[in-house]
Amino acid sequence: MDSDYIFHNGDDIRNMGLEEMRRQKVLLASELKAIDAQISDLAFNNYGTYADAGRATHDCSKTFGEMRDKTVNLSDQAEELTSAFVEFRAKAKQLSEEQDLVRKALDKSNPIWELLTLPSRMDICIRAGYYDLAYTLTNYGLQLQQQTQLYRNPLIKKVADHLVEARAYLLEELFNKFAGPLDLAESIKVVNNVRKMPSLTANQLRIAVLQHRDIYLEKQILDISGNVDMIVQAIEIYRTSMYDTLVLYLAVFPENEVVRKNPNADPRWESWPVLPPNSILSQWVISNVKKMLDLITKADVKSAVDLSAVWTKLMAMASSFGRMGIDFRPLIAGKLTKLIEQRFRQNVQEATSRLTGSSRDIVMIGIDPASLPQFETAPDSPPVAAAELSLWDDMTIYTNSVVDALNGLRFILTPVVLSTVVVSLRDSIRSILTWLASSHSNSANFSRAVRIVCTSVAPFFEKCVAFFFPPATVSKIFGSSISKRQYLQFIELDMKQLAASCDGAEKIEEIVKPLLQKRTLEEIGLENVLKPTKPEEEKTKFFLEETVEDGPGLAEPQEEASESVKEQETTSELEKKHGTDFETAETQEMVSEPVKEHETTSELTKEQEPAFEPEKLHETPPEPMEPQNFGESEAKAAHNPEAHLELGETSENQEIREQEHKEVVITSTEPEFHEIDLNSAVLIPKIAVEPQLDPISEYLTELTQDDPIEEEEGWGWGDDDGEEQEISSKEVESPKEKCKKDD
């Protein structure tokens, strides 16, 4: 084509002119520029293509390089990938099997559904009382646990565990049958079902039954809390519940039941002896009795309890239980005795505080005490206070309060509380004397008040104590040989000692000593005072016996067995009224040997009298004797000369004794040797000094220490709280020492 064009152009060039050639030249030049432009565009486009190709080549090289690097470790991971595929295959197979198991389990005809309902059936059996079926289900649960292959299944494991754990719930439900009213036949069935349970010993069964009975007992006590007669109701509840439990226990657990040993126990281990069945029951009874006594004590703190009714009910309850082989009367007696002692001590302290706590002056009625009537009481009647006591209203109120406290002891008049009673009264009198000396020593009625306390109140309290606790009864109960003198010394409210031990003793002793000063027989006027009103009814209370050495003469005085209580009280009243101790120092220092017929007066002098040694009194104590009414016998002898003949005396012996008495009065310089009227006095046989009262508590403690009493339940002469330092710690004083103190 180009050759054709060039050919034509050559023809044209030859044929065209210059203008035309110029025009063609311009056209060619423009076409050349267009071609150059196209060439430039083509060159530019080719460069971009080359650049893109280069970048693509670089990227491809990089990509292939990375691929090469990654494919290098692919061979190393091929083994791990293979094992992962194998594991995946196994899991897929297991999942397929489980899927198949679930599909079978969803079938309602599968026995697994019955197995899953066993826990709920177990609960229904327990609540409905089908204890035999419940026990069978628990045994089935144990069998499932023993089958290892089945127990590995989570469903079966859960069911088996629930059935076994329900055994504790079954036991609790069975034992709860005892936490309510008892039915003996039903209770026996329950115990038989409980005995089927393994790993439950006989003692555990007994203790569990008693514990659930305590739960029921506590529920009943809570129901009556706050009632007015709560204590009486509580005692009745304790009695009924404990009796029912005792009957059930003896019916279910007989005494002759043989306790079997555990065959699985290793004989090489140390084994403790098995307790007998009754020991558990006894300890349970004692524990409940202690709870009941604690309940009574707490209730008594809030408000006073009628201890008389409580004592009666508790003793009746203890007696009924004692017939069944469980006697807890010593425990009740010990606890209630302490409670009664505490109440008596508190009542006396309150009465004393009411008297001494008032800041009022001592106000008394201005009546001459001599114009007041004198009361005489029958031998067996309660003592009557002196009429002078009614002149002081505050003291009358105090005395009545103490008498009320003593009357509160009527239902438990045991010598065990005697020490507490005496100590409380002594402390009360001492507090009153201290109050008078510290607050009312300047009062116009101070001396009169002290006299009333010393001569009216204290003797009246002594009579009350002796009336409530007769010496003969105390000696009979304890089998003691304590004489009446020792007993009266023990309960004596010694005003001299109390006055000396109180604060402001100097002021009190100035008044007490003259009141209690002993007077001679001549000062008293014994002939007029002791003159018998009915001589025909009076009988001598002493007799003389002949001895081998002395022949007809003096013998030891012996108290007649038929001596009445009235004669004893007459002696005591005369001693209190006249302040005279008929056992003078003369009779205290005389030896117990009879006086020989030809004994000279020099043998009775002071130098030849036997020395008084208190420490030897306990070695050879004389035969105990009752206090004698010496003054009455002397008066009868003075007014009835025939009495000497009745006593076996001769006129010669009478003259000798009169002369001896006269010599004693003349030669003796001791203050306690008083002048005696020979016309009215009869020589009294000398009485040896009796031992002091200190050994009483020891003897009684030894006598009763073997009693079956709970620990810390003492049955001795009083308790540890009732110590009296004045009597127990003081030795018997000789007449010489007494005279020195009186001076």
From Swiss-Prot:
Residues 704-726 have a biased composition (Acidic residues). It is a peripheral membrane protein. Pfam families: Dor1. The keyword Transmembrane helix does not apply. Disulfide bonds: none annotated. Component of the conserved oligomeric Golgi complex which is composed of eight different subunits and is required for normal Golgi morphology and localization. Required for normal Golgi function. This is Conserved oligomeric Golgi complex subunit 8. It comes from Caenorhabditis elegans.
